């Protein structure tokens, strides 16, 4: 059996590995679009730990397991305590014996890191206060499907507008790793910080990607993809709605004027859920340049590929495993034979 692989951050994967994962995801998507559901996860069980509520993440993981022949178990907030009454070590050890793979959407990034360290099965980060790596994969699938004619990924410019959320940082990680140009256009005090920049510097040195952090709206010009997220994600408890609006509105609202400034062929992306009338207008969200609902569908696309990628590698059999399997099958059939 091969050593297990976790998916905690894309920083642990090479560009080639991530592109292979996306290629696998899109191939499975094509199969399903044509009516064939490959049973690649037959008899596999996914344990889903949620410290935070979710729509797209939960539905995508449950649907992915079901479509590929497996099963998902939803462990809701309050049903399981990571490091509470039971230690993370004990929780991960037990779930490793009951499931084939785990996904955790956690409040603190260290919780999913500790879970992966203690588990003997693969662990996926479904989002933490540090990053959102499954969103990254869906975004990469979407950008590849909507590449401008004649351009490669490394020719493209991606601009994130607004607050430095986990999604903003995750988008910066995946785009710079692909050798793309990334821009964070946001107000001072709500931009990617020195820790983020240190990580991005390391990636760009190897990939040839580049990034800019600015509050100058001219940085939007020439964008191939314009991306935004909600304005209250990180500061909901600290800032009132009125304070948030004073900081972000109207300069950082993606509207038709901003899209025009980016360029005629620019596509609009949003991780959802969106607050229409705040970070995004109805006109752009529902307009011809919006690919945010394709992006939402590709959460499922990429999660199918990720589950197969991690489980197929981890569960790869050798001839001795097959011999043991046949022997166990014979013993069970003998036991069940009527006397």
From Swiss-Prot:
Pfam families: OTCace (PF00185), OTCace_N (PF02729). It catalyses: carbamoyl phosphate + putrescine = N-carbamoylputrescine + phosphate + H(+). It is found in: Cytoplasm. GO terms for molecular function: amino acid binding; ornithine carbamoyltransferase activity; putrescine carbamoyltransferase activity. Keywords: Cytoplasm, Polyamine biosynthesis, Transferase. The keyword Cytoplasm applies. It is an enzyme of class 2 (transferase). InterPro entries: Asp/Orn_carbamoyltranf_P-bd (IPR006132), Asp/Orn_carbamoylTrfase (IPR006130), Asp/Orn_carbamoylTrfase_sf (IPR036901), Asp_carbamoyltransf_Asp/Orn-bd (IPR006131), Orn/put_carbamltrans (IPR002292), PtcA (IPR024903). Pathway: Amine and polyamine biosynthesis; putrescine biosynthesis via agmatine pathway; putrescine from N-carbamoylputrescine (transferase route): step 1/1. Carbamoyl phosphate binds at residues 54-58, 105, 132. GO terms for cellular component: cytoplasm. Putrescine binds at residues 270-273. Signal peptide: none annotated. It comes from the Bacteria. HAMAP family: PTCase. Catalyzes the phosphorolysis of N-carbamoylputrescine to form carbamoyl phosphate and putrescine. Is involved in the degradation pathway of the polyamine agmatine. Homotrimer. Belongs to the aspartate/ornithine carbamoyltransferase superfamily. PTCase family. This is Putrescine carbamoyltransferase. It comes from Streptococcus ratti. The gene is ptcA.
